[in-house]
Amino acid sequence: MSNQHTLLSSNLLPVGSNISTWWNFGSMLLTCLALQISTGFFLAIHYTANINLAFSSVTHIMRDVPYGWTMQNLHAIGASMFFICIYIHIARGLYYGLYLNKEVWLSGTVLLITLMATAFFGYVLPWGQMSFWAATVITNLLTAIPYLGTTLTTWLWGGFSINDPTLTRFFALHFILPFLIVSLSSIHIILLHNEGSNNPLGTNPDIDKIPFHPYHSYKDILMITVMITTLFSIMAFAPNLFNDPENFSKANPLVTPQHIKPEWYFLFAYGILRSIPNKLGGTLALLMSVIILTTAPFTHTSHIRSMAFRPLAQMLFWTLIATFITITWTATKPVEPPFILISQMASIIYFSFFIINPILGWVENKISMTNS
């Protein structure tokens, strides 16, 4: 009977009764990961990692392989869905102060960096114009590292320019990294279950818990269904919504695209990179745009965990979201006025959030102490 009770308890897994829809994005991300690995496997069967054949093999998958177009579109649109979900997941963590669970937050940041690396390697594989030139620009940033830069770039390229060895190793990395993401996700979930999920109020959830199944599991299934429906709708009616028209042309090292830009989900980091005219400074800013998330648990000063009861912090948070969108938009534009200035101002505001937020928390504490 005790064994049955243990099994029952593990299935019920008590969770705070008031967690909202924002808590469903973890399960949606897991669904995205499963979708990407399964569709990626079928694409890898037909893909050829050779600079002369890669573009043709992608065309072959789309035209000749039964349901190849489904796999290719699901994989491409699924990547965008993955990033939409992860950005919402991170925003939820910032808003509700979930970063105070340090181990979960830091493992999540490592997951984000790994995911971005995986997506970048994947974007290069079709060997279209934008794939080639995005790879050239981004990998060239390694040369900004003093002393080691040139050696690292040559090692990554497998030669003195982006060529066949580069594509081969990018394919190998793109294939292996999702399994690292699975491992990191397992660690992320195990660490989360040490303390358990928090809730929108930021209060101790132990006083009011309900079984995970059926209450929250059905809620998860609903949101996963909404996500998959959206995914298939985009695939059916606008399959090239997130694609760059430039990438429908085969890579040509002799012709530079008018405006080099990565996929939309990297544009905020790329916009920050472009806003700094110095190569090393831009590279550091690019890295810091993601790594700065790791500072959040150590700079939280407010006595209140969630922003739900902090109107000034809410204004600051929504300014960050607007800034993120602004940087993404400016990164799609050419490097010319007024976009340069807008991008620079937005980049300053983006980083300012992580400086102003702890100061604001300290000010709020002072005000609350004065009032009490």
Swiss-Prot record:
Binding sites annotated in the UniProt record for a ubiquinone: 193
Topology of the protein relative to the lipid bilayer: Multi-pass membrane protein
Co-factor binding details: Binds 2 heme b groups non-covalently.
Entries under InterPro entries matching the protein: Cyt_b/b6_C (IPR005798), Cyt_b/b6_C_sf (IPR036150), Cyt_b/b6_N (IPR005797), Cytb/b6-like_sf (IPR027387), Cytochrome_b (IPR030689), Cytochrome_b_C_euk/bac (IPR048260), Cytochrome_b_N_euk/bac (IPR048259), Di-haem_cyt_TM (IPR016174)
Compartments where located: Mitochondrion inner membrane
GO biological process: mitochondrial electron transport, ubiquinol to cytochrome c
Keywords: Electron transport, Heme, Iron, Membrane, Metal-binding, Mitochondrion, Mitochondrion inner membrane, Respiratory chain, Transmembrane, Transmembrane helix, Transport, Ubiquinone
Binding site for heme b b566: 89, 188
Protein residues bound to heme b b562: 75, 174
Gene Ontology molecular function: metal ion binding; ubiquinol-cytochrome-c reductase activity
Pfam family, one: Cytochrom_B_C
Chief site of localization: mitochondrion
Requisite cofactors: heme b
GO cellular component: mitochondrial inner membrane; respiratory chain complex III
TM stretches of this protein: 25-45, 69-90, 105-125, 170-190, 218-238, 280-300, 312-332, 339-358
Record's subunit section: The cytochrome bc1 complex contains 3 respiratory subunits (MT-CYB, CYC1 and UQCRFS1), 2 core proteins (UQCRC1 and UQCRC2) and probably 6 low-molecular weight proteins.
Similarity remark: Belongs to the cytochrome b family.
Role of this protein: Component of the ubiquinol-cytochrome c reductase complex (complex III or cytochrome b-c1 complex) that is part of the mitochondrial respiratory chain. The b-c1 complex mediates electron transfer from ubiquinol to cytochrome c. Contributes to the generation of a proton gradient across the mitochondrial membrane that is then used for ATP synthesis.
Additional note from the record: Heme 1 (or BL or b562) is low-potential and absorbs at about 562 nm, and heme 2 (or BH or b566) is high-potential and absorbs at about 566 nm.
Protein name as annotated: Cytochrome b
Taxon lineage: Eukaryota, Metazoa, Chordata, Craniata, Vertebrata
